[in-house]
Amino acid sequence: MAEKQTAKRNRREEILQSLAQMLESSDGSQRITTAKLAASVGVSEAALYRHFPSKTRMFDSLIEFIEDSLITRINLILKDEKETLNRLRLIVLLILGFGERNPGLTRILTGHALMFEQDRLQGRINQLFERIEAQLRQVLREKKMREGEGYATDEALLASQLLAFCEGMLSRFVRSEFRYSPTADFEARWPLLAAQLQ
């Protein structure tokens, strides 16, 4: 029985990896059908539906992976790092690095892969970005408590500026068909961003 469940889990992971790879390839710029996905995995469409009731559930699983990866790592940064600017730098770098390592999933983060899918999926991505922005805002607000001095500019404005930078770099990565790395020149860009945090 355990072998059967392991095989089913492995097949599910194989389907999700195949979908992510298709999103990374030129197929990712078009609607991905279950027929194309089944052919990529090497199974029938019926076999896909034995593991996932719909393509939407496949995207849900990928979004869940994105959420878990980013939020878990952000929480680790907040636990381990105490200095505000370094916390912010590491969170921004985490988002950009995740996008760079997972180009197919970056199409989901930018909404590009969700254009032909249910609106609910885009809503989940919107909620993820709202959670990240709220986390950035909290880090900015805690500066006064941690370091004795806050920011002259509203923390909500600063948080949205940082997130807009991340979203812009991820969009540029997708638009360029993954030629322009989101982390390229980050060490030169960060001082420009940090200078705005006053």
Swiss-Prot record:
HTH tetR-type domain span: 9-70
Keyword Cell division: yes
Cited PROSITE patterns: HTH_TETR_1 (PS01081), HTH_TETR_2 (PS50977)
Keyword Cell cycle: yes
Compartments it resides in: Cytoplasm, Nucleoid
DNA-binding residues: 33-52
Cellular-component GO terms for this entry: bacterial nucleoid; cytoplasm
Pfam families tied to this protein: SlmA-like_C, TetR_N
GO biological process: cell division; negative regulation of division septum assembly
One Gene Ontology term of the molecular function aspect: DNA-binding transcription factor activity
Tree of life domain: Bacteria
UniProt feature coiled coil, ranges: 117-145
Keywords of the record: Cell cycle, Cell division, Coiled coil, Cytoplasm, DNA-binding
First-listed, main subcellular location of the protein, grouped into a coarse class: cytoplasm
Subunit structure: Homodimer. Interacts with FtsZ.
Family indicated by similarity: Belongs to the nucleoid occlusion factor SlmA family.
Role, per record: Required for nucleoid occlusion (NO) phenomenon, which prevents Z-ring formation and cell division over the nucleoid. Acts as a DNA-associated cell division inhibitor that binds simultaneously chromosomal DNA and FtsZ, and disrupts the assembly of FtsZ polymers. SlmA-DNA-binding sequences (SBS) are dispersed on non-Ter regions of the chromosome, preventing FtsZ polymerization at these regions.
The name this protein goes by in its record: Nucleoid occlusion factor SlmA
Organism: Cronobacter sakazakii (strain ATCC BAA-894) (Enterobacter sakazakii)
This protein's encoding gene: slmA
